[in-house]
């Protein structure tokens, strides 16, 4: 099964254990992923797109000057801060992918463990007695 297909199944119909792992790992790695996106990935993406800072992308909802920073525009009124949304969405995608890889690894480890050998069932007493009678008749 391909990795993208597994990710789709995980995202669409994950179970409670997957969700619990996601919450725990997400809490632990959230700040790391946030730093990765804000300090490493977004500056590179901004450089590719002409030195733009996505965190300051917004649409002014009450005719503010479009050259203001996001903080200044928020002081003057309502803004639609879609640049921040792009950054947070990228954080989510990276975090979800990391969690998916961890769950995928756990599932792979579960599948590779050999099943425990089954102990033979105890022979019922009447069957054991019949076998003894049979064996004594053969002699």
Swiss-Prot record:
Keywords on record: Cell inner membrane, Cell membrane, Ion channel, Ion transport, Membrane, Transmembrane, Transmembrane helix, Transport
Subcellular location: Cell inner membrane
CC terms in the record's Gene Ontology section: plasma membrane
GO molecular function: mechanosensitive monoatomic ion channel activity
TM regions (residue ranges): 10-30, 40-60, 80-100
Pfam families registered for this protein in UniProt: MscL
Listed Gene3D superfamilies: Large-conductance mechanosensitive channel, MscL, domain 1 (1.10.1200.120)
Quaternary structure and interacting proteins, as annotated: Homopentamer.
Sequence similarity: Belongs to the MscL family.
PANTHER family reported for this sequence: LARGE-CONDUCTANCE MECHANOSENSITIVE CHANNEL, MECHANOSENSITIVE CHANNEL MSCL
Protein name: Large-conductance mechanosensitive channel
Native organism: Janthinobacterium sp. (strain Marseille) (Minibacterium massiliensis)
Name of the encoding gene: mscL
